[in-house]
Curated annotation (Swiss-Prot):
The encoding gene: ced-2
Subunit note: Interacts with ced-5 (via C-terminus which contains a candidate SH3-binding, proline-rich region). Forms a ternary complex with ced-5 and ced-12. Interacts (via SH-2 domain) with src-1 (when activated and phosphorylated at 'Tyr-416').
Low complexity bias (residue ranges): 182-206
Positions of region (Disordered): 179-217
Organism of derivation: Caenorhabditis briggsae
Protein name, as recorded: Cell death abnormality protein 2
Pfam families tied to this protein: SH2, SH3_2, SH3_9
Length: 277
């Protein structure tokens, strides 16, 4: 069991792409938020991330650290925070679980709130790296409904990923209400509805509006993606690039073009340019 309260490899479960520096500061600066609580978000610098951390109780101090892409002379890519380089984000987070940033180390991730509890009606083994496999009868926590076909979910182990909406059924009754209540309470941390619930609903509304744009159109890549080298149907993309989206495929992915190359990209890796819609 992870004694420090988070799994570095599941960083997207505490990544809030639409959150501003001011909102993160307000959220983590709540008096009830403990020292070492953190989240990840997009930086104001395009294509980069920020790590926001509650570091002290005095003044409800929240610090923000820029995480930038780091490309070596040999072409290998990693990430850098200040002058320290790491092969990837999980390695960076793991490093600061045991070491102090300014005044605190990373102790507990600020998790996304639960909006619904579902149970698997069929077994789902997963087809892509972004999928979350589950068993028939397994309970899952829904974090966002990106579109009508695929939802972002979290299992009992804290692993997050995408699940097909037609493979699950909403769990009703006292158990579901208790789980949603606990998830909201933990994530908003006593902020009287002004915390993560607000950010989550704003993000979900934005994503739903983008779910069915008029194609073809352009979209911004939100995550680096290096697909299997033996699968030529997948498109390799880097965060910050602009791709031309050609069509939506039956599996929920998009067929896109980048620098003359055409391949498929998961919808969670792109954000449509609303100006083109």
């Amino acid at each position: 069991m992870n004694m420090n309260g988070f799994d570095p490899f599941e960083w997207r479960s505490f990544y809030f792409p639409g959150m501003s520096r001011e909102d993160a500061h307000k959220l983590l600066g709540e008096p009830r938020v403990s020292i070492g609580t953190f989240l990840m978000r997009d930086s104001s610098q395009p294509g980069e991330y920020s790590l926001s951390v509650r570091e002290a109780d005095e003044g409800n101090t929240v610090c923000h650290y820029l995480i930038v892409r780091d490309v070596k002379e040999d072409g290998t890519a990693g990430v850098k925070i200040a002058e320290q380089s790491f092969p990837d984000i999980p390695a960076l987070l793991n490093h600061f679980k045991m070491r102090v940033l300014t005044e605190a180390s990373l102790l507990s991730a600020y998790k996304k709130p639960i909006i619904e509890v579902v149970v698997g009606t069929f077994k789902f083994t997963g087809e892509r790296e972004t999928d979350l496999p589950f068993e028939q009868g397994e309970r899952l926590e829904i974090l966002s409904k990106t579109n009508n076909d695929w939802w972002e979910a979290r299992n009992a182990l804290g692993t997050t990923g995408l699940v097909p909406a037609n493979y699950v059924q909403v769990q009703s009754g006292e158990f579901a209400n208790e789980r949603i209540s606990k998830g909201t309470s933990q994530s908003s941390i006593g902020s009287s509805g002004n915390g993560a619930e607000r950010f989550s609903s704003t993000s979900t509304s934005s994503e739903n509006a983008e779910a069915h744009p008029t194609l073809p159109t352009t979209a911004k890549v939100t995550f680096d993606r290096v697909p299997n080298a033996y699968d030529p149907t997948q498109l390799r993309v880097k965060k910050g690039q602009t791709v031309r989206v050609l069509e939506k495929m039956s599996n929920g992915m998009y067929r896109a073009e980048l620098d003359g190359q055409i391949g498929s990209v998961p919808f969670t890796y792109i954000r449509f340019n609303t100006a083109n819609q």
